[in-house]
Amino acid sequence: MRSPSELWFRLKQEIGNAASFLHAPALAAGFTEIPQAAILPDPDSFLALLSGSDYAANIELLAGMICGHRFPLLGSVVETGLEIRWRRDFARGIESSLKYFRRISYLDSARAGDHKFIWELNRHQHLIVLAQAFRLTRRREYVDEIQVQLESWWEQNPWLRGINWASALEVAFRALSWIWVDHLAGRALNSGIRRRLLLELYRHGVYLERNLSVYFAPNTHLLGEAVALHALGSLYPELPRSAVWRRAAAGVVQEQMERQVRDDGSHFEQSSYYHVYALDLFLFHALLNPGVSVVFRGKMRRMAQYLSALTSQDGAMPFLGDDDGGNLFHPYGDRRRFGGATLASCCAFFDTGEWRYDARDVAVQAAWWMGPGAFTKKPREPGPDAAPCLFANAGVAVLSNGPVHIVADTRGFGHAGAGHSHAHALSVVCRKADAGIFADILIDPGTFTYTGDPAWRSRFRGTAFHNTVRVDGLDQAEDGGPFRWLNKPETIIVNWTSGLEFAHLSAICCYRGITHERQFLWIAEKGLLAIVDVVRGSMGDSHPHLVEQFWHCGGEAVAASPGVWRIGESATVTMPVSALVEVFSGGEYGWVSNAPGQKEASPVIVVRRTGVLPATLAVVFALGEESVADIAVEASEGTPRIVMGPARSITFGAGAPAIEWI
């Protein structure tokens, strides 16, 4: 039920849009061509530091592809041909109309195409690459291509018509791209093109001021829109209403920092990928608004700490929750390592070497945002393993952060409808390094699609596509649509105990009359990760239930001996010989998506048990020199115990487990 304030807000919004549609915003006839405010760093101050680098070579390579209308998008290459049809889904051959933007059914992929792929191209982030290539090489062809594409876009996307005006966030992304194009190549544009660019930037600002997603999507959508509106007001102070934009948008960004970022630094979407988006947005805003509060900066710092903890030593980040394949500034390269550029930028902003990143990450973002000073900061040197840590607000624990990287997520679901969350409460992911080279042991299979295929959308964000337990074939919450969960479970952290040698996490997930308790125990000295699940029903429940454990493997899963499976080259998982186990790739559950729109078969181990509750299941992952040939699971008076042979056992009671190892 919408409140009176929301109804009034939306009414004013639509009246304003309708009036603006009839009379498109225009600049005064005498409005002169204005320079961009000198806030962003002058590229000439650091371009010499990029000369001859792998990064510079890659920019030229990307620019060549873009000039040939071969666009790297979301892990694939879209070839548009000579004419770029900006409203076209090139994969499906569908092009939507030029109706008034509110009449575009962009969620209906059969009529509009997959809006995600259409919008990704229309963010115009590839034009930033062309502008960067121009500054690095001074080759005029890159500016010429920018001008041709801008004029083409303006012709095919008139004010408030068509799918590319249907999302305020996409308008914001495009505005930010054009800001960077103007900053890097504005003086090289023909005067008529640049005057038109200023007009279109002004129109984007008018649109954003009126269409902020205050009620529609008060998450990273609203944040991104406000950051872009503030940037327009700050970098173009001579535009009409620029002062209003700066003041209003800065207030929204401050409010969203307070609302969206928890005290432990985690973002409330419960998605690692969207955490990077949010941190980049807050950081860019802080660069343009040095008056942000100490509290604002403190939360940004904690966001960086959280991101650093989620990132393994080689810079890879697990995809917890949705990943949409994009990036605020440079959506190219290995998406799992996008966080490295963010951490490099945070180190430059906070003048610290607190976080680890690859030195090459500086060129991707920090250099362009903060200038040559970004190159003087040094990432944290490799050293002793970081201590296990718990982010209580997120419900995320990093049990090991060294050559073995283990992340457990007890909560799974984010704020409100949890639109970018997956049903993966009590799940775990794991990576391991051998001779310094990391390999995935347990993975999160990713996202695959948002609206392109509803059935696959439900699968990839469902419980069975994560390393947790499913009961009676049902997800932990009810699917309320592609961006909504209903009846989310209650999750509680029961115990967290950690030290140099071990980490123990116990948590409960309650839903549909089911209580699932999972305990994780990492024994660093032995390189063993023990996981025990106890599933209980409601009082008086005497019906049989199907309980399934899913283990999505990063490498091939091969039976090594009864009850033991080898995962890849350097890990094993052991479970009771009596367990009913199935291992397969593809089919219903065995898939991984490394980029939106792409999926491939991937091994999954499924353990099934049917019977009256309670049910106790346990596994032990061997990630070091110690091996586990077999295990037995005992559950006396509700106290699970894993027995791994004579004088080797783990008893899980209240508090930290009791370990016997002789």
Model-flagged regions — what are they?
Residues 266, 270-441, 497, 610-617, ...:
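Carbohydrate-active enzyme catalytic cores, enriched for enzymes
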Residues 442-446:
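Catalytic Cys-His active-site segments of thiol-dependent hydrolases/isopeptidases
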Residues 116, 121-123, 394-396, 423-427, ...:
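Extracellular structured ligand-interaction cores
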Residues 172, 323-324, 331-334, 348-360, ...:
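CBM-like, beta-strand-rich accessory domains located in the C-terminal region of large
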Residues 97-98, 104-108, 112-301, 310-311, ...:
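Aromatic-lined, polymer-binding surfaces characteristic
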Residues 90, 401-403, 412, 469, ...:
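Short, flexible loop/turn elements at secondary-structure junctions
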Residues 1-11:
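Boundary detector for helix-to-coil junctions that initiate low-complexity/charged tails
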Residues 16-109, 116-121:
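Extended, charge-enriched "interface" segments that sit outside catalytic cores
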